[in-house]
């Protein structure tokens, strides 16, 4: 399975010069708050997305006394390659795969898939539909190659439709050509999503069967395409929504409004589950997604788990550890206390482990 065999980081946030050789399986990263633990995970995510999972303001990633940061890694596995990303203060971004300029950030994501679980992932339960679309579209993007083009074209068509809706004099006949295109693209997008989300839901249910609290809670995932499913076709619903769309100035129906409803005993899961149970559900969602990805693509994503020991009891951490081990994934886990991190994160059979200490931006191997 693909894994980072070497990681070099320069002038990134508060990190000093980093040059480490991670374990292909489990990597425990510990240090005080503010020491740079999360920054190390953030640097790895930049290699996968050409952007941070913590901020959209790239200048915050560059050390004050420098003009650019650089992150470089050697990735080993069935398809070995080298990847590097540099971002300058001016905004110029350079990304390379095996010395050649990457065509896009999507190419980086395809070559180095990464799953991130941190405090922000609670948005899957607490937030709006946008967070859940981002979650399941990660899988759709990687598995269904036609999705990316269909989605990009769909977004362009909806933007054009929204622009027309804001005109003072507009009749539905002016929108019909755009709605025909939107309907065709929506059908492709929906088909891609259904083919990915259906096995995702099945995998999630199987995983939750291993969590004791789930015996007393009826957890349900339900995909919603972004329009009402029933007798009326999506194009007809677009036409009927014209008056409301015109009043609002934007399109209220379509794949850009799709969702994955997560309920417990018929109510929103966030209203029923404890914080620890919510974290367990979120973990299961990410593992289920990785399982489907592995089944379809034959690889596993790298997992970045920030402050994982918090809000999870030893039993749930043991379950998560087993799930990750069964996947064969490379994992980076951060925590404050080394002993606690090592004690609550059980070592699986035949699993190599490395511990890294981060202190004032310096990353060293811990014996």
Curated annotation (Swiss-Prot):
Keywords: ATP-binding, Cytoplasm, DNA damage, DNA repair, DNA replication, DNA-binding, Nucleotide-binding, SOS response
Origin: domain of life: Bacteria
Any matching Pfam family: SMC_N
InterPro entries: DNA-binding_RecF, DNA-binding_RecF_CS, P-loop_NTPase, RecF/RecN/SMC_N, RecF_2
Main location: cytoplasm
Nucleus keyword on record: no
Localisation: Cytoplasm
GO biological process: DNA replication; DNA synthesis involved in DNA repair; double-strand break repair; SOS response
Cellular component annotations (GO), alphabetically ordered: cytoplasm
Residue stretches spanning the membrane: none
Protein residues bound to ATP: 31-38
Entry's Gene Ontology molecular function annotations: ATP binding; single-stranded DNA binding
PROSITE patterns: RECF_1 (PS00617)
Classification via HAMAP family: RecF (MF_00365)
Function description: The RecF protein is involved in DNA metabolism; it is required for DNA replication and normal SOS inducibility. RecF binds preferentially to single-stranded, linear DNA. It also seems to bind ATP.
NCBIfam families hit by this protein: recf (TIGR00611)
Family in the record: Belongs to the RecF family.
Name this protein carries in UniProt: DNA replication and repair protein RecF
The organism of origin for this protein: Saccharophagus degradans (strain 2-40 / ATCC 43961 / DSM 17024)
